[in-house]
Amino acid sequence: VKISFLINNIYGIGGTNRTVINLAEALAVRHEVEIVSVFRRAASPKFVISPRITVRALVDLRPGSADRGAAGSKEPSEVVPRQEEFYAQYSRFTDERIIRELRRTDADVVVGTRPSLNLFVAAHTRDGALRVAQEHMTHLAIPPAVRAEMARVYPRLDAITTVTEADARSFQENTPIPGVPVVGIPNSVPEPVVQPSDCTHKIVVSAGRMHRIKRYDLLIRAFAELAEEFPDWQLRIYGDGGEAGKLRALVTELGLNGRALLMGGFSPIESEWAKGSIAAVTSSAESFGMTLVEAMRCGLPVVSTDCPVGPREILRDGEDGFLVPNGEVEGIAWGLRRLMADEPLRRAMGEAALRNAARYDPAAVADRYMKLFEDAARRRAAAVRGYRAPSGPRKAAAGTATVPPAGIGATTVDVTADGAGRLHFRADGPAEGRHRRQFVLRHRPSDGNRRPDLPLPTSREQLDNGGTRYTATLGPAALDELGDGRWQVTMRSPKSAPVHMKAGLRDTRALIDVRERVVGRPPSGPTTWNLPYAQPNGRLMLRTVLREEHAECTAIEIGEGVLTVQGVLCGSRTVEPGALFVVSRRGQHGRNFAAPVQLLDRRTFRAEVPLRRVVDHRLERWEDWDWWLQPDPDDWRKTRVCHLLEDFPDVKGAYAYPSLPLVGDEDSEYSVSHPVRPVWVRPYCSASGAMAMNVVDR
């Protein structure tokens, strides 16, 4: 059977793209599958797609393409209703391309994936193909004018699917389509490669786009209610979007800086779910609830609002999580408290979540779709003379929906940190042949002084699908060669240039425990740290840390004109009575100010820095003041205060500290040429991990 999925833009990101790819890859084990994207705006899809699946685009909108500005591209679509969400993207030109594709397709089944495309599928797909509409949006969220057009055109369909049973009922009640079955089939989520969470790390995880419908404000407020009761717990929210600024302001307002972290986008997300012990979903509406299933497949119990329509069909309340009232901070806090206070309950519910989420495996969901197609074919054969249901030979089962990548550059590398200073690399690549490929680390210097490449001893294993599995381990001893820096993770053979590899899973959860040990018992020797991370272009990098001595920042508080810093000294020295915390103005007009240090023990310190001294001695409108610790008043040597030891790369973004306004002093060195105005002081962590603060005259 040949199955064709028609999608808006497979080259972008989004829940529909991800679920269509999951289903397509499961169907591709036994059938011929293609994904036809209306638009193409990038060289390659953001999500990895199995080479089994053919990917084509109808309209190429990349710079320089002939389709940009083509005849008819400025004229409105005659098929897509004006009220449809993506109406502005469509035109008479796109109408022509889509209709031509549907009339010429040789697919046995054509599946549309949003209302605009389903209208095309219903009205223009050739008669010999089954027409199926996937509805990923909650039915009543579709504008009434679009639903009216669906009611007019959808009777030509053979089947309609929604992602929940509740939405299937809503569809039938509000937009009945005589003679066309509406079936609830959930989205699928593959079993993660990452090991499930053991529910011991005191982290609440949430993930999704930063949009008001996700109601992260409720989650942050609920966590704030519990912050004093559970001082060692942390909230991590992953995602990008327009609400991030408001949420940062709320974190500051509630005094949760360093406790509630906005982590930004992260892919693949499975390794971040597995770091947590509780997943939280606080949306006001969810058409399905992919994040619930993703978290459950990683072994997390879920606290979710009982919002329409997905969560109540996914969660088994009291067994693998808690459903709490929609829109209520108190209910969310109640659910979180139940799990934060009871580790055995977390573990039991996490194990139940792992079992219960198996019903969303792509193979199981693909079987339901095949039954839907077969039932539709029987109905069509009974009603339409001359129609022949597809009955060609199926592909031989390969046991898995994956095949080797077409080239080494398309291969992703998974990395696991084991907590003992080792990183384990794994990549499933193309057939090895005579290449003798191996992992090689290439230095990416900040000063132009590049160090020699470091080849890693690499093992190779032939896979059943004809590909090759490459594995290597980087041990702590290698840091003597790597030193402090950033390294590209590449693969090369004796006869080929290095290829910078794509980042897959980065399972760094073991580093959470390592940081806790280091902060609790700072090392008396050098500090080492290996952290894999992905560049914005998706390529895999390694951040290596080798410091003979540094002060690791563990807490920052900003009060009325006072900055309070707490940290531990790592290295051979100890913090002596009379030690000083030093702030130093960067640049050619350097100046130092020192504050006394309070000793909490021989390696742990606390300092209170009066910010007025810095503000009143500024010389420029924008200044940076670096932080140092002088552990011994009789030894002039200072050591840098840093925030290096985390399990994620963007410390600066996650720990976004607020700005404190101070009024400039009329007698300051700077007020001679500028009148008194507010001066803002903000601590930050630089990209190198060094702590500093901005002093800005606005």
Question: Where are these predicted regions, by residue range?
Answer:
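N-terminal strand-loop element at the rim of the active site
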Residues: 7-13, 26, 30-86
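A conserved mid-protein helix/loop that constitutes part of the nucleotide-sugar donor-binding site
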Residues: 17-22, 202, 206-228, 242-249, ...
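Donor nucleotide-sugar binding/catalytic pocket of nucleotide-sugar-dependent glycosyltransferases
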Residues: 133, 140, 155-193
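Aromatic "clamp/platform" in nucleotide-sugar-dependent glycosyltransferases that forms part
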Residues: 265, 284
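Short hydrophobic beta-strand element within catalytic cores of glycosyltransferases
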Residues: 301-305
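A short, well-ordered alpha-helix in the C-terminal region of glycosyltransferases
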Residues: 331, 338, 345-359, 368-371
